[in-house]
């Protein structure tokens, strides 16, 4: 085989090694250990950096959750406080007089309301039993009965296999 000689002849061509490619590759056996150590150091820095980011994110989420729960609690407390407020005091009335006045108002309004409902029911019942309303549905039913009789007659005559036609023919 042919061997290529390097252009720069600073290396002895045949004295140091048997092939020219092996002479250009550095042979540091201790360099491999340093490379692994360098990779380990860089990866550990990345790991510490990522763990710091994760912890900061988790801490901010925990704070956000606590603050939102606190805000939710305060909102609900405010709503319950508004709902549980006592009735506003009227001028010159004590709090014991207000419910008594409401009871009296209910007692006077309830009979009037029931009478109004009864009179409305009476009006609707009387309108249902009035003569024009009653005659109109009866007239419609009568018209429907006449239509059914006229429609049945041609069907029986035109149907050849009906039982009536068979009895009439025999």
From Swiss-Prot:
Cytoplasmic domain ranges by topology: 57-170
Q: Which residues are glycosylated?
A: 8, 28
Bilayer-spanning residue ranges: 36-56
Compositionally biased region (Polar residues) = 152-170
Query: What is the protein's membrane topology class?
Result: Single-pass membrane protein
Which GO cellular component terms are attached? apical plasma membrane; voltage-gated potassium channel complex
* Source species, domain of life: Eukaryota
Any idea which UniProt keywords this protein has?
A: Glycoprotein, Ion channel, Ion transport, Membrane, Potassium, Potassium channel, Potassium transport, Transmembrane, Transmembrane helix, Transport, Voltage-gated channel
Q: Where is the composition biased (Acidic residues)?
A: 141-151
User: Residue ranges of region Disordered?
Assistant: 1-29, 121-170
Report a single Gene Ontology molecular function.
potassium channel activity
**What conditions trigger expression of this protein?**
Up-regulated by lipopolysaccharide.
Q: What is its main location?
A: membrane
Q: Where in the cell is it found?
A: Membrane
Q: Which family does it belong to?
A: Belongs to the potassium channel KCNE family.
Q: What does this protein do?
A: Ancillary protein that functions as a regulatory subunit of the voltage-gated potassium (Kv) channel complex composed of pore-forming and potassium-conducting alpha subunits and of regulatory beta subunits. KCNE4 beta subunit modulates the gating kinetics and enhances stability of the channel complex. Associates with KCNQ1/KVLTQ1 alpha subunit to inhibit potassium currents.
Q: What is the annotated quaternary arrangement, including any partners?
A: Forms heterooligomers with KCNA3, inhibiting its activity by impairing localization to the cell membrane. The stoichiometry of KCNA3 and KCNE4 in the heterooligomers are 4:1, 4:2, 4:3 or 4:4 respectively. Increasing the number of KCNE4 subunits steadily slows the activation KCNA3 and decreases its abundance at the cell membrane. However, a single subunit of KCNE4 is sufficient for the cooperative enhancement of the inactivating function of the channel. Interacts with KCNQ1; impairs KCNQ1 localization in lipid rafts and inhibits voltage-gated potassium channel activity.
Name recorded for this polypeptide: Potassium voltage-gated channel subfamily E member 4
Species for this entry = Mus musculus
């Amino acid at each position: 085989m042919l061997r290529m000689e390097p252009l720069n002849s600073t290396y002895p061509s045949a004295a140091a090694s048997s092939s020219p490619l092996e002479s250009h590759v550095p042979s540091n056996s201790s360099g491999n250990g340093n490379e692994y150590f360098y990779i380990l150091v860089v990866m550990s820095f990345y790991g510490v950096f990522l763990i710091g980011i994760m912890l900061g994110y988790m801490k901010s989420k925990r704070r956000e959750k606590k603050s939102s729960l606190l805000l939710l609690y305060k909102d609900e407390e405010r709503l319950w406080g508004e709902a549980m407020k006592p009735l506003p005091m009227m001028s010159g009335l004590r709090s014991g007089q207000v419910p008594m006045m409401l009871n009296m108002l209910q007692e006077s309004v309830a009979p009037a309301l029931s009478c109004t409902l009864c009179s409305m029911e009476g009006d609707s019942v009387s309108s249902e039993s009035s003569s024009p309303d009653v005659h109109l549905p009866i007239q419609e039913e009568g018209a429907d009965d006449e239509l059914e009789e006229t429609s049945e007659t041609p069907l029986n005559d035109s149907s050849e296999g009906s039982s009536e036609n068979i009895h009439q023919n025999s």
